[in-house]
Amino acid sequence: MRATKIVATLGPSTDADAVMRALFEAGVDVFRLNASHGTQDDHARRIKKVRELEAEFKRHSGILLDLQGPKIRLGTFKDGPQFLKDESVFTITTERVEGTADIASTSYPDFARDVKTGDSVLLADGALHLQVIESDGVAARCRVVHGGMISDRKGINLPGVKVSTPSLSKKDVADAHFGVEQGVDFLALSFVRQARDVLRLRHLLEDAEAKQPIIAKIEKPEGWQNLDSILEECDGVMVARGDLGVEMALEKVPAIQKTIIEKARARGRFVITATQMLESMIESPLPTRAEVSDVANAIHDGTSAVMLSAETSAGKHPIEAVRMMARIACETETSIQQQGFLSAWETQAQSIPEIIADAAYHCARTAGVVALAVGTTSGSSARLLARYRPPVPVFAFTSNENVARQLSIVYGVDAIVTSGMTSTDQMLTEMEHLLVSTSRAKPGDNIVFVAGQPVGLRGSTNMLKLHRVAGIR
């Protein structure tokens, strides 16, 4: 069983029923909807299709709605794309104008108040570099340091500038409510700068009586600097290397990625590594060798999941991209287990559930077991076990379909929905039956059984049993 989860972004390239079915068969664990593109009707249609495939394949998949966030963009250009020459002057204004090679508007009303003389302005993901000459609070005149083609609604990045945009725009609030109504399983918050950004979204969800896990996207220098406090408030993080690599020096991104993964794992947070993982497969049926190494290295770092963006949403080979990512993950995991690269997180257990998880991991390493079977109400026990990166699958048994879907992102966890159970004996009997009947275990195999007493009480994990499978009764 592949332990590293695959997140695939849906879009025009995946809308055909046959493609969606093939993605499901290829092993996508979580389907991502990018709120920056498409309409709510588009996303609702895709959500409906994922749920239909879930029922058909009898396998739970997560749906992640990625909120756009306060992305700063240029306006539109009167005569189409324009070429900005090196050393020319280009003005960015908060007033509405039709763009030319000399001036363009911006969607961000405080742009000219936030920047000052000498600040860098990067356009189109860093392809063009401007430097502010002067700003009067309405418009900023900029020298074109490195020019190029520019077109409608290209992104603006302001490295080193503390922008005053709110963490949640009106569009984000509307999209978050839409996601809750549609029953998505995760919400990703873009351009997180500090812990209170996460708390704003958390409070919005609480007001709606919703409990979707929040993924903090680390893509701003402030988010990187405040990582520890952000990790305290979020449920998972995304290493969003696109904007991160624009606003910070590119050569720093690999080390930042490793640190984010390490710290997230230490706190028991799942982590998604994203952006340009198999970028060449937007056009090519095969990735570059460097891209294969990039995916493998993220898995060596300990990421919970790897993500495909335009490769699946707009690329020519979405199915091949997922299959390739799955093959890379399986091969890398085999290498890791053989060579012991990915060790358990060495930490001092602080609670009874942590002590049980630590003991279960060591049983998995030394007792010849084929699986860890855990009964879970909220999913927390399964997430604790996954933190240790055990060498065998974690089968999480829960009576809650939402919990099963939320575990779809967690490394090494396969969630199975069961009926409600009233005792650990009943739980073990049903687990054993399901594992054998689905060929996940066979009579004579050893498994580690983890549960809590009293059954059904959140956070009650307090027992471990090394159990030999007897077979179907």
Model features per residue range: what roles?
Residues 1-473:
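Non-catalytic helical/linker scaffolds that mediate oligomerization, partner binding
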